[in-house]
């Protein structure tokens, strides 16, 4: 009876362990009462399982009854009396009963208080990124506003010219590709445009002219490069043919003919200037060989004294 009162008190306080000392005393007293009780009758119902259990502060144990009822009574006490804060933690046992009890009870006040403030790491990161993105968006909006102010409060539109205006601008550009401020203002008044528009048109026209000239120069250089490449290939082929012909002629011609060395014939041609130089040298050698030699006197001159006496 005392054990039942103890169990109800534990259930009333939610297993907070307030009856630890009382459980020790009641456990010992319950064991003594079981020893003094007479054996149960055949027609009587077995005693409830709560009376077979005691509390020793560290876990549940059965009273001094028979051994064949000890283990079953201990398991029954574990199932009936739930004291999660006072019993030991079994790492091999899943907390199914506690989960079921918590689900049946519903969310507690502490959980309801924590739900609005609780958030996952992803939500925390998203909130931080949102806070960081807000200044960047504000900065972009401010930059766009400043651009609008600089551009006069609106986007710059492309200048549309009539045929007459374009013709006048083209003629003026052919005469002068650059304009001074006075010419620019006069042309703007003539065409009913702004000086800035005239200046921009001339800048674009100069850029287009330069680009076209660059393209023309590039095409000309490409053609020159192709021509030089073809000429270089032709010269290489001729050089290889001449070398092969020279080697073949040198191998076929005899080296000595009647004791005199005969130079191998060659088909190499010389430029006109080289031929003129060679012909002039040959003519000089031939003329010097055909001219008669000057006679050398063999009789000595008479002495000067004999000539004076004869005179």
From Swiss-Prot:
Free-text tissue specificity from the UniProt record: Expressed in root provascular and vascular cylinder, provascular and vascular strands of leaves, provascular and vascular strands of the whole panicle, in mature embryo provascular bundles of scutellum and embryonic axis and provascular and vascular strands of young immature spikelet organs. Expressed in differentiating and differentiated xylem and phloem elements, and in outer and inner bundle sheath cells of all vascular bundles. Expressed in auricles, ligules, culm, guard cells brac hairs and pollen.
UniProt-recorded Gene Ontology molecular function terms: DNA-binding transcription factor activity, RNA polymerase II-specific; sequence-specific DNA binding
Biased composition (Low complexity): 119-145
Record's keyword terms, sorted: DNA-binding, Homeobox, Nucleus, Repressor, Transcription, Transcription regulation
UniProt GO cellular component terms: nucleus
Gene3D superfamilies hit by this protein: Homeodomain-like
Skewed-composition ranges (Pro residues): 294-303
Induction conditions: By auxin and sucrose in primary root apical region. By wounding in leaves.
Leucine-zipper as annotated region, ranges: 212-256
Residue ranges the record marks as coiled coil: none
Comp. bias (Polar residues): 280-289
Compartments where found: Nucleus
Annotated region (Disordered), positions in chain: 29-69, 97-160, 279-311
Pfam families documented for this protein: HALZ, HD-ZIP_N, Homeodomain
Principal location: nucleus
Self-association and partners: Homodimer. May form a heterodimer with HOX2, HOX3 or HOX7.
Similarity field: Belongs to the HD-ZIP homeobox family. Class II subfamily.
This protein's name: Homeobox-leucine zipper protein HOX1
Organism the protein comes from: Oryza sativa subsp. indica (Rice)
Gene from which this protein is expressed: HOX1
């Amino acid at each position: 009876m005392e054990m039942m009162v103890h169990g109800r008190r534990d259930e009333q306080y939610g297993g907070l362990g307030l009856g630890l000392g009382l459980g020790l005393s009641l456990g010992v007293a319950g064991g003594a009462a079981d020893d003094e009780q007479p054996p149960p009758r055949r027609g009587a119902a077995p005693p409830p399982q709560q009376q077979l259990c005691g509390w020793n502060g560290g876990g549940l144990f059965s009273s001094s009854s028979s051994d064949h009822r000890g283990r079953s009574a201990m398991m029954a006490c574990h199932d009936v009396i739930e004291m999660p804060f006072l019993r030991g933690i079994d790492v091999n046992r899943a907390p199914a009963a506690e989960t079921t009890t918590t689900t049946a009870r519903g969310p507690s006040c502490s959980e309801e208080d924590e739900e609005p403030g609780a958030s996952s790491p992803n939500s925390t990161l998203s909130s931080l990124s949102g806070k960081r993105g807000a200044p960047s968006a504000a900065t972009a909006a401010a930059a766009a506003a400043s651009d609008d102010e600089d551009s006069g409060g609106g986007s710059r539109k492309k200048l549309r010219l009539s045929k007459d205006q374009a013709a006048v601008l083209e003629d003026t550009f052919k005469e002068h590709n650059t304009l001074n401020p006075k010419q620019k203002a006069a042309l703007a008044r003539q065409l009913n445009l702004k000086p800035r528009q005239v200046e921009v048109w001339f800048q674009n026209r100069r850029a287009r002219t330069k680009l076209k000239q660059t393209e023309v120069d590039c095409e000309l250089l490409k053609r020159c490069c192709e021509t030089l490449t073809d000429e270089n290939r032709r010269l290489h082929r001729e050089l290889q043919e001449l070398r092969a012909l020279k080697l073949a002629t040198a191998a076929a011609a005899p080296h000595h003919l009647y004791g005199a060395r005969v130079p191998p014939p060659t088909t190499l041609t010389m430029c006109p200037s080289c031929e003129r130089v060679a012909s002039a040298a040959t003519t000089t050698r031939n003329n010097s060989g055909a001219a008669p030699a000057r006679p050398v006197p063999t009789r000595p001159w008479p002495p000067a004294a004999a000539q004076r006496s004869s005179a």
